[in-house]
Regions:
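Long, low-complexity segments enriched in small/aliphatic residues
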Residues: 1-25
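Long, contiguous, secondary-structure-rich segments that constitute the structural scaffold
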Residues: 22-38, 42-164
Length: 164
């Protein structure tokens, strides 16, 4: 990091989703409804962050929100955030919010210099700052199990009982 962006961000997957898909499966969103921002307790204390509260993660390319997850399972002055998108925003007046509100990839580079071996952009070791988001969750984001009711399956007809 540096003085303006003193924390190192790494990103990666969580086991609930395959790459960027399946965010519209209500059962999976109940398990992992929003992206967590994992950080060491000393990092959280240093920046005035409480476990479970909403935080901003910001660098010169933009800022995104996630929920703080304070854990000893990550190095000090490092945070981890999983890429995320919110399909519930696709049917709104601003569908771009689906991929801009909580998607850590907003903070990555979109122009060279890319990884010379793979030709990909950098997903690890991004300098950021992290701080409380007093405004809380993004407006309209589905974060509670009852929010996912519109996506629950509806049965069109009864299923015949074939085993008794």
């Amino acid at each position: 990091g540096n003085d303006e962006y003193p924390v190192m961000l790494t990103e990666g997957r969580v086991p609930f989703y395959h790459h960027g898909t399946l965010r519209n499966i209500p059962y999976l969103r109940e398990l992992y409804p929003v992206p967590l921002v994992s950080m060491h307790p000393e990092t959280a204390e240093k920046y005035g962050i409480v476990d479970g509260e909403w935080v901003w993660v910001e660098n010169s390319r933009g800022k995104v929100r996630g929920k703080a997850f304070v854990t000893l399972g990550i190095a000090k002055d490092t945070i981890h955030m999983e890429r995320f998108w919110n399909p519930e925003y696709l049917d709104t007046d601003d569908p771009s919010r689906a991929w801009t509100e909580m998607n850590v990839n907003i903070l990555t580079k979109t122009d060279g210099k890319f990884n010379p071996e793979h030709g990909t952009y950098v997903l690890r070791g991004l300098a950021v700052k992290v701080y409380p988001a007093p405004e809380g969750a993004p407006e309209g984001a589905w974060i509670n199990p009852t929010d996912f009711e519109p996506w629950m399956p509806e049965y069109s007809e009864s299923t015949e009982v074939v085993f008794k």
